[in-house]
Amino acid sequence: MNKLRNQTLALASILQTTTLVDQLASTGACDANSNQASLKSIITSSTKLEEVFNSKQDLLVGIAALKVVLGNKTKRIQQVILYALALINLEKKLMKNQTLLNQITLEIDLIKNQEFFEISHANSVARLAQLYKSTLGGLNPRIMINGEQIYLSNKHTTNHIRALLLAGIRAVSLWKSQGGKTWHLLFNKKKILNLISSLEGLNK
C-alpha cells in the first residue's frame, strides 16, 4: 500500500475508536465488527496495517467518519474529532513517559498470552479498561466523555469505553508509524477524499 493510503487508513482507525466511544456513550451500543477489529489491534504488535486490520471491512466505521470529518461536519462528528485530538495529545505524553509505556507494553503482552476469552468478551474488556484506568487514566488533562448518564453510569459501558480509548492510543501510534501528521489533512484533503471514494467502491 502506498504511503498516503496507509496514513489514511491509520487515521481512519483513530476515528473509528472515537466514533465507537461516542456510540457507546450516546446509545449504549456500537458497531460489533469494527469494535472487534479495534480491540484486537491492541494485542497485535505489528506496524503493518494489513496485519493489524485484516481488510477494509474492519475499518468501515472509521472510513465513514473520516469522510464526514473532511466533508460537511455535523455536531456529532465534532465530538468524535475532539476525542481524536485528545488521544493524539495523550499518546504524545505517553511517549515521553518510558516507565508508563513499559508498564502498558508488559500488561498487553500478559493479556495477549494469558487471555482465554475473545478480545471483545466482557472479561477481556474489563482487563483492558483497568489497564487504561491505572496508566493513561492518570495523565492530565483526562479525556472527558460526553453522553447519556444512563449509559455512562453502567460499569460494562464505561469499561468498554476505556478499552476503546486504549485502542485509540494504539491507533495513534500506528498512524504516527506511517508518518501521519495532522497538517497533512490540510494539504491532502482532496487526495484523501478520492482515496476514500475508491475504498468505498471496493466495499460495494
Curated annotation (Swiss-Prot):
HAMAP family attached to this UniProt entry: HflD_protein
Subcellular location: Cytoplasm; Cell inner membrane
Family in the record: Belongs to the HflD family.
Pfam families: DUF489
InterPro entries registered for this protein in UniProt: HflD, HflD-like_sf
Top-rank lineage group of the source organism: Bacteria
One GO term describing the cellular component: cytoplasm
Gene3D superfamilies hit by this protein: HflD-like
Annotated keywords: Cell inner membrane, Cell membrane, Cytoplasm, Membrane
Official protein name in the record: High frequency lysogenization protein HflD homolog
Its membrane topology: Peripheral membrane protein
